[in-house]
């Protein structure tokens, strides 16, 4: 992700929510959701947080609650994320993976038209700033093992189990 200027940071708001996989810290700007962080993180509170940032946080919280209740299979949120061109192509390709399904890192590499870049795809997924919303937990190793996950393999298992139990 690109470094944010002091002015951009001042307009950022955060919210800690409790979910079935533990606490998540949501971070948003006036443009959209910037991060979903595993665990509770106390971030500096700015009096300059815009109403728009607060609105993005509220909407993200609602949609995440719907997801964990099995009532939402796809997120509809404005995102304010940045990475390299390759990272962004990998992150947005995650939206092509259906709820309750998994694909391999090699299959995701083909989705972004870089069939030999499966390791780079895994690395980009590891830097996904909005895990769950852009569902990198749905990407597994070609041999069927879970591979890695920024939130830990126990959380990846829980997310996949949740989606498999709520399919249909």
Description of each model-found segment:
Residues 98, 129-132:
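Histidine- and aromatic-rich ligand-binding microenvironments
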Residues 119-121, 126-128:
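Regulatory, non-catalytic segments
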Residues 1-116, 162-168:
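Basic nucleic-acid-binding alpha-helical/helix-turn surface characteristic of O6-alkylguanine DNA
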Residues 132-139:
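Short Lys/Arg-enriched helix C-cap and helix-to-coil transition segments
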Residues 142-168:
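…primarily DNA-binding HTH/wHTH and HhH modules…
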């Amino acid at each position: 992700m690109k470094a944010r200027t002091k002015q951009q940071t001042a307009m950022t708001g955060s919210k800690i929510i409790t979910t079935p996989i533990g606490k998540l810290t949501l971070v948003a700007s006036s443009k959209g959701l910037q991060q979903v962080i595993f665990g509770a993180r106390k971030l500096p509170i700015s009096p300059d947080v815009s109403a728009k940032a607060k609105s993005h946080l509220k909407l993200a919280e609602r949609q995440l609650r719907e997801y964990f209740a099995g009532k939402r299979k796809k997120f509809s949120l404005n995102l304010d994320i940045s990475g390299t061109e390759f990272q962004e192509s990998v992150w947005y390709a995650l939206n092509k993976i259906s709820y309750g399904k998994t694909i391999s890192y090699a299959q995701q590499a083909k989705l972004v038209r870089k069939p030999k870049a499966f390791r780079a795809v895994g690395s980009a997924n590891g830097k996904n700033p909005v895990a769950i919303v852009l569902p990198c937990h749905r990407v597994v190793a070609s041999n069927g093992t879970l591979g890695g996950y920024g939130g830990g393999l126990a959380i990846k298992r829980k997310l996949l189990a949740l989606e498999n139990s709520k399919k249909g």
